[in-house]
Amino acid sequence: MIQVLLVTISLAVFPYQGSSVILESGNVNDYEVVYPRKVTALPKGAVQPKYEDTMQYEFKVNGEPVVLHLEKNKGLFSEDYSETHYSPDGREITTYPTVEDHCYYHGRIENDADSTASISACNGLKGHFKLQGEMYLIEPLKLPDSEAHAVFKYENVEKEDEAPKMCGVTQNWESYEPIKKASQSNLTPEQQRYLNAKKYVKLFLVADYIMYLKYGRNLTAVRTRMYDIVNVITPIYHRMNIHVALVGLEIWSNTDKIIVQSSADVTLNLFGNWRATDLLRRKSHDNAQLLTGINFNGPTAGLAYLGGICNTMYSAGIVQDHSKIHHLVAIAMAHEMGHNLGMDHDKDTCTCGTRPCVMAGALSCEASFLFSDCSQKDHREFLIKNMPQCILKKPLKTDVVSPAVCGNYFVEVGEECDCGSPRTCRDPCCDATTCKLRQGAQCAEGLCCDQCRFKGAGTECRAAKDECDMADVCTGRSAECTDSFQRNGQPCKNNNGYCYNGKCPIMADQCIALFGPSATVSQDACFQFNREGNHYGYCRKEQNTKIACEPQDVKCGRLYCFPNSPENKNPCNIYYSPNDEDKGMVLPGTKCADGKACSNGQCVDVTTPY
């Protein structure tokens, strides 16, 4: 039986009072009225787009001039972004809006190297910026025919609950497998390549029915709230070499699709099940987060599965819309996503150069946008041990359904490279303004690209990982390093297995992966359970019916292992999860007898599976 780690986060609650404008709550002690002046960089006579790629505003804070530089967050949305809501009679309505001309920006303050900004410019400037180490909020004042904005320090927002909030970590029988510590030394070439690769999290957000009611049954208001939150999350993860893109948004505008309740662990379990059985069938994504207007029991404001990324059920989290200040909700969501990505709560010794950090167990009223050294170590260990594959997959050019956007780090149709904005790009091979290769460059990235040129034909670009793999070489005509491997069916691991698609699957290794380093394969008698045709033993499924193994096929069904641990001396053990029944089956290509290997639940001649 596997254990699941449910990780909760608790924080002070700011009750919603009917408006998204913080000033109207009466919780701001002191603010300054400013009149931001836009400084245009467009040449005279040029056509000005609704929302420019870069903008600059000037205003005064504490009597001192401030210049705010903004760049559009071009990676905010994926190219196949979709939105779903429901009609009063329950009909699903899905649209694919064009979102490249959006109004969400990141930025900095001129002459302040430590400054940051996350701003919505949809109707005036709304968001936060960091100036000389202090956090400020800015939002338009609701005055007729006026460009007046309010600027106030975050510390001047009165907190309605100053009591410390503790975070709880619970364990439940039906949960994701615990994080296993990995050695930081002696990485295999495959692990090192994985660590160096860019990571992409394709995020899907869901707003429940209470959120819809909370924002006045206004789809635009709910949508704006979600956009504001993701605009804060993306730069937090960009520092970790993780690109977060919003692939979809769903608003439960007629009724909830699950029973959202104050018990956070029950709600998370229901949401994970709904994602696995419903949402994933409609929309491909890597991680889903539910934003709810309900109050969870106790101080809990969020909950997530530790290490669940890429799992059909456990790559999920739930977050309470606990504050009028959207960046506090965004940090809570970034925290829950951090748990999905293998990060545990920070200890007292953890540091990020400021306090607190994103993965603090109890979020104080001091906002932080940095991961601690402990979080970075947790994440690295998780990646090394598990190597989740979904976050390596960036959108394919052929999947793009809206116009390409230069500067979003995704190479799309019509682009030769994409290294981000002109300010952030550090790629000497790529012209960030056009997303084309610079003059004389043949490539910008790839294992067969070196200093903007193709490596010579025959140059080794990837070493053989094991005896079933082959060293890969460059062609001299491409930046790609095509993967190749030894012929299938070739004996491997001292004749204990046969090569299968570049790997050598044997039962002994599979038992160790499931039950730990001391595990061994069970005796032959245990495999006779596979003749029963139930969840304890079967060979394959047909139309969701478990088919019992024939006598000669029993070693191609469920894998039986002996954990050989102090707490488990049972000689016949299976790995079983009701939400992922196929995990724990003998892998395809595994040797089941001399000259035979498993294929579709049958022990067949070794040449047949290939």
From Swiss-Prot:
It is found in: Secreted. It is an enzyme of class 3 (hydrolase). Residues 403-488 form the Disintegrin domain. A motif (D/ECD-tripeptide) lies at residues 467-469. The active site is at E336. CDD domains: ZnMc_adamalysin_II_like. Glycans are attached at N218. Zn(2+) binds at H335, H339, H345. Its cofactor is Zn(2+). Ca(2+) 1 binds at D286, C390. It comes from the Eukaryota. Disulfide bonds join C310-C390, C350-C374, C352-C357, C406-C435, C417-C430, C419-C425, C429-C452, C443-C449, C448-C474, C461-C481, C468-C499, C492-C504, C511-C561, C526-C572, C539-C549, C556-C598, C592-C603. Residues 21-189 form a propeptide. Residues 1-20 form the signal peptide. One of its GO terms (biological process) is proteolysis. Keywords: Calcium, Cell adhesion impairing toxin, Disulfide bond, Glycoprotein, Hemostasis impairing toxin, Hydrolase, Metal-binding, Metalloprotease, Protease, Secreted, Signal, Toxin, Zinc, Zymogen. One of its GO terms (molecular function) is metal ion binding. GO terms for cellular component: extracellular region; plasma membrane. The disintegrin domain belongs to the long disintegrin subfamily. PANTHER family: ADAM A DISINTEGRIN AND METALLOPROTEASE DOMAIN (PTHR11905), DISINTEGRIN AND METALLOPROTEINASE DOMAIN-CONTAINING PROTEIN 28 (PTHR11905:SF32). Belongs to the venom metalloproteinase (M12B) family. P-III subfamily. This is Zinc metalloproteinase-disintegrin-like 4a. It comes from Crotalus adamanteus (Eastern diamondback rattlesnake).
